[in-house]
């Protein structure tokens, strides 16, 4: 599982499977990104729960139907590891550990000096810094069983998974190429989704910290309103103002991420200088407006006009 800032071939189909939706996109070119094809299919409740496949057979049948409809049969695919099953963390290791021995050392230390929320990880590492006393590495770890099950799902649906990606890096690539990047920034990248918020801090183009924040409230309060046979929008069935008030808990957790970076990770030497907000949350515009009034940092999003398409696409997702 190799996580890199820059992705590979345009011809690879990019696939996202979330608790409530499957989305795909195929690019004609990457810089600037030009979308050639895209599509989405909303899932019944309970097929995927917190990133874990709960009904494998039903999901395979749904995905197989999507593959036929989208005409991506037997294509190579890049898929996202579920955020809820992912850890990004800076780790210090002894300086005398050779670079080609780091992976073995980490496996030995799992459960001892290195603790993860799952027992069997698959991981990748990036060397950050070597000092007189230690090496600092960036650890990307995912739950191996979950990643393997998604790969098996894709294979059984007649696709060829060639790469597992993560949403913080995939979104940062988009931000990187959009022309908004300042190399001096200490960036908080926030992805607001229907049930969860992913908050990642980037320094020198590397994600040095990530936290998943569960949004208060029940997914049962949302219903799908179909635009056509292929797609739709999620509609909140309760009181919108009450829901926006519930997001106070989410903002409190974001405050804690900002404080943790300033006082613990950077030892009061740095603080977040910019916040970029994206995601597929139906109330994203209201959320961005609230964050602009709440935080002293510049709060922005990736310009929608930056992503172009080769033709009029039948796809109303916030990402396209």
Q: What positions do the PLM features span?
A:
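Phosphate-interacting basic helix/loop segments used at nucleotide- and nucleic-acid interfaces
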Residues: 58-70, 175, 182-185, 261
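Non-catalytic, solvent-exposed interaction/assembly segments
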Residues: 1-109, 133, 148-151, 158
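Active-site neighborhood for divalent-cation/phosphate handling
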Residues: 76, 80-178, 304-308
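Glycine-rich phosphate-binding/hydrolytic loop that grips phosphoryl groups
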Residues: 300-320
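Glycine-rich phosphate-binding loops at beta-strand->alpha-helix junctions
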Residues: 269-297
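Small-residue (GG/TT-enriched) beta-loop-alpha framework at ligand/catalytic clefts
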Residues: 13-14, 19-37, 79, 131-239
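Adenine-nucleotide phosphate-binding core of ATP-dependent small-molecule kinases
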Residues: 216-272, 280-282
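Short glycine-rich phosphate-binding loop at a beta-alpha junction
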Residues: 72-84, 154, 163, 265-280
